[in-house]
């Protein structure tokens, strides 16, 4: 961090510590809070140059412990903005949709829906492929609701099964169009 500060660069702080990657809301805010305090108190690191990545993780895996990964990221982004003045939030958008690799349309739609929810709640920047973004207004409502269910609202096995069924339907339709 001293070298980064010496050159006047910003730093991206991943929500990892000695115990590993933060996967829950509580661990994300614990690690980000600790890192912020260390950077500010020990180095007087400019708060606007501290960018946190509170780990956007894969959803719709069928594993119950993954149900809250989408909402936990967004809640952590809100907490960072409310409690760590000046800090910013980033995240890699390919992660939450990884369970749908091979179905690019569903993955790209998930990225759009994720940003629609995460930006107003504190996500300042994202690591993404801009040429693969789908305009928000072109996302079919049924797919938007299914994705929101998996990422933010229902977060259960039924929501996952609904999105998987829609993804398969879309995949088959796209294959038939070829």
Task: Please describe what each predicted stretch is.
Residues 14-19, 55-62, 92-98, 130-131:
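Active-site beta-loop-alpha junctions enriched in small/polar residues
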Residues 26, 59-72, 100-109:
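Short glycine/threonine-rich loop-to-helix capping motif typified by GTGT followed
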């Amino acid at each position: 961090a001293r070298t980064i500060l010496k050159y006047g660069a910003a730093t991206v702080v991943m929500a990892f510590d000695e115990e590993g990657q933060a996967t829950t809301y509580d661990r994300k805010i614990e690690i980000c809070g600790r890192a912020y305090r260390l950077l500010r108190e020990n180095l007087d690191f400019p708060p606007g140059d501290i960018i946190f990545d509170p780990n956007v993780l894969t959803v719709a895996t069928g594993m119950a412990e993954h149900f809250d990964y989408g909402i936990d990221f967004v809640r952590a982004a809100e907490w960072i903005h409310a409690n760590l003045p000046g800090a910013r939030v980033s995240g890699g958008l390919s992660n939450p949709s990884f369970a749908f690799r091979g179905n690019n349309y569903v993955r790209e739609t998930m990225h759009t829906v994720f940003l629609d929810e995460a930006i107003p709640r504190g996500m300042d920047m994202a690591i993404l492929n801009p040429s693969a973004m789908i305009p928000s207004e072109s996302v079919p409502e049924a797919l938007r609701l299914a994705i929101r269910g998996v990422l933010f609202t229902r977060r259960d096995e039924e929501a996952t099964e609904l999105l998987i069924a829609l993804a398969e339907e879309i995949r088959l339709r796209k294959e038939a169009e070829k």
